Amino acid sequence: MTAALDPAGIPVLPRGVRLHHDRVRGVEVLLGPERTLMLDGIGHAILSEVDGARSVAAISDDLAARFGAPRDRVGADVSEFLGDLAEKRLLDLQDG
């Protein structure tokens, strides 16, 4: 079980980790050192909002508004997804 992320924390992709479009498979992937994580549409939507400036809460607010979804549900999903990536060392969380 992933620990809840601080909503004020600012997610950033660490050095050597980046979003990439895999043209062969036609999917978005997260590339990290010696690993690749294929993303579904939701994962890509979340990671495309990670800019190193906005907090987890701000990203959740923007996604909830964009997709017309309940803020509490989106916030929980964003926190869980980013927390999983942080546990895998594919994401860092800076103090907000």
Residue ranges and their predicted role:
Residues 1-48, 94-95:
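Acidic, low-complexity/disordered tracts enriched in E/D and polar residues
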Residues 35-96:
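Long, charge-rich, low-complexity alpha-helical segments
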